């Protein structure tokens, strides 16, 4: 099919080339032979009057013109997919849909297992691909390459819809044999102790307590940096180091390890966990179904947490 002289099938080829950055892989993705894909590249170059890609080894390197075309083409194809091709009613019990979700190890351990267990009962053929924090998460959302982000709301952009899940607080943790934690933790002690700190993504973004400390002109003595909160407790065992992590995750590890939970000596801010999805998938029936489950399970967990907190204070 042509539109103003452009074979629209070429847009599918260009999208695959931008995603895969390899001629053979792109051809395989859209079920073309390699010669057919090479011909598509030649036609794209003629139509747009640009080289579009140069070769670096076996990798295709897009030109600025190709980079500029990538986002609108991806969004147009995604819109067609969701509004025309996939408008049939979504039946969870019969679906084999795969949901790609970026989330932290914290949310995987304390929350998302609930989602997986419930979906296994209601939609046994539905699959999940859980992905680690990415520095490009907003771009992945925009391209429709992930279905959801699940992490602190403050890291989310305003470009896509989102919903809050629950509030979380930060606590300090250390080995139960650490004698420095036998008395109330002071600011001076906290700052002088060796810390295990979680940072995220390839750029090692600082986490919430790090931002708080930097804003107040405070700098900890970080001895170990780990990728994710879940790696903090194992590194603390049999040491005099300290870590800072979400309360729910600390309680999870407290049951399994010699972990001691103490109040931070500083008023570390709480944070809001949220879920975000691509704007293009806002009316997608499968996305709506999954969002409903995520929000319901978040409400159930928040209610159980509040009830437990009330019992402790009675």
Swiss-Prot record:
The lineage of its organism: Bacteria, Pseudomonadati, Pseudomonadota, Alphaproteobacteria, Hyphomicrobiales. The keyword Transcription regulation applies. Belongs to the LysR transcriptional regulatory family. Pfam families: HTH_1, LysR_substrate. It comes from Bradyrhizobium sp. (strain NC92). This is Nodulation protein D 1. SUPFAM superfamilies: Periplasmic binding protein-like II, Winged helix' DNA-binding domain. The gene is nodD1. GO terms for molecular function: DNA binding; DNA-binding transcription factor activity. Residues 23-42 bind DNA. There are at least two nodD genes in B.sp strain NC92. NodD regulates the expression of the nodABCFE genes which encode other nodulation proteins. NodD is also a negative regulator of its own expression. Binds flavonoids as inducers. Residues 6-63 form the HTH lysR-type domain. Keywords: Activator, DNA-binding, Nodulation, Repressor, Transcription, Transcription regulation.
């Amino acid at each position: 099919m042509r539109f103003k002289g452009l074979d629209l099938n070429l847009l599918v080829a260009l999208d695959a080339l931008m995603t895969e950055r390899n001629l053979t892989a792109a051809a395989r993705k859209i079920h073309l032979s390699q010669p057919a894909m090479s011909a598509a590249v030649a036609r794209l170059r003629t139509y747009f009057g640009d080289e579009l890609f140069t070769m670096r080894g076996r990798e295709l390197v897009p030109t600025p013109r190709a980079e500029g075309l990538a986002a609108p083409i991806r969004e147009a194809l995604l819109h067609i997919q969701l509004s025309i091709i996939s408008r049939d009613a979504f039946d969870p019990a019969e679906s084999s849909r795969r949901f790609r979700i970026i989330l932290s190890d914290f949310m995987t351990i304390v929350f998302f297992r609930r989602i997986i267990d419930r979906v296994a009962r209601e939609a046994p053929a539905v699959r999940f691909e859980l992905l680690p924090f990415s520095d490009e998460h907003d771009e992945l959302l925009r391209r429709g390459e992930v279905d959801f982000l699940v992490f602190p709301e403050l890291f989310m952009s305003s470009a896509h819809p989102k919903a809050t899940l629950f509030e979380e607080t930060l606590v300090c943790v250390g080995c139960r044999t650490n004698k420095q934690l036998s008395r109330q933790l002071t600011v001076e002690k906290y700052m002088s102790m060796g810390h295990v700190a979680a940072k995220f993504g390839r750029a090692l973004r600082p986490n919430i307590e790090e931002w708080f400390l930097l804003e107040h002109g405070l700098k900890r003595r970080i001895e170990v940096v780990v990728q994710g909160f879940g790696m903090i407790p194992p590194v603390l065992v049999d040491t005099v180091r300290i870590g800072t992590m979400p309360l729910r995750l600390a309680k999870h590890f407290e049951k399994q390890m010699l972990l001691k939970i103490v109040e931070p000596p500083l008023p570390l801010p709480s944070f809001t966990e949220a879920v975000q999805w691509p704007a293009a998938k806002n009316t997608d029936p499968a996305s709506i179904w999954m969002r409903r489950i995520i929000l319901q399970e978040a409400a159930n967990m928040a209610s159980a947490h509040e009830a437990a907190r009330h019992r402790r204070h009675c």
